Amino acid sequence: DVPLFVPTARNRRMKEARQELRGFLMDIIRRRRSEGLQNDLLSMLMTARDADTGETMTDEQLHDEALIIFFAGHDTTSSLLTWTWYLLSKWPAVEEKLHAELAGVLGGRAPGLDDVPRLPYLRQVFDETLRLYSPIPILARDLTEDDQIDGFSLPKGSLVVLALYNTHRHPDFWERPEAFYPEHFDEAAAAARPRSAYLPFGAGPRICIGMHFALMEDALVMGEVAQRFTLRLAQPHDGEVRYVGVTRPERPILMKLSAR
């Protein structure tokens, strides 16, 4: 790929698109400051204060946060749905159990926000998909103080990188590490497992801000579509991946829809 600083036609179009998007977001931020706060995410970000300094975010910081929410939310949502339907097509027994839950709770109607907590197996299906195909393949953290991990001394400022693929498929933590087995996330199994064995959205105060929104959005989409259609692979696919910011299929996953 040509570096972004080389003024090719493609790079110029990308630069223009980024500038247009930046102007769009900054206009929203300026209007909100002049019109007053509302009951939404942007207003929450505007009123948030740094725990150490007590300062609120600058317009530049608000722009960056909004950009992350827009694009990270889109990628995470599409990635989770793609891999979930791929896995369901490979594991029909799981799909049958999911359909039974959807039928029992929704009875053919469109799901609403109040229905999401009443679909525990759907959440297990999503969690198991995220275990096998975590949207973000690695997590990185800078140490703010000296530490020791498993006998290794790590000085302040070290960069610690967690390989989620390895952690999420480690046989010490998962009964069937290479299988699509939503029962990994039933109450008993989850309680017996170290909390840090499953980190698809990160952990701690810097956990993904869009986690709950993404899961809710995907639950509404899955609840609507899975009641009406069965999805099957249109051509063989072995689940090979490539990492381009998020975990994506190496080649498109093409599926056929048939009415239920």
Where are these regions (language model features)?
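Conserved cytochrome P450 K-helix E-x-x-R motif and the immediately C-terminal K′/meander segment
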Residues: 23, 27, 109-150
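Cytochrome P450 catalytic-core helices
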Residues: 76-101, 211-229
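Cytochrome P450 proximal C-terminal region
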Residues: 103-111, 207, 212-260
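Cytochrome P450 catalytic core segment centered on helix I
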Residues: 1-55, 59
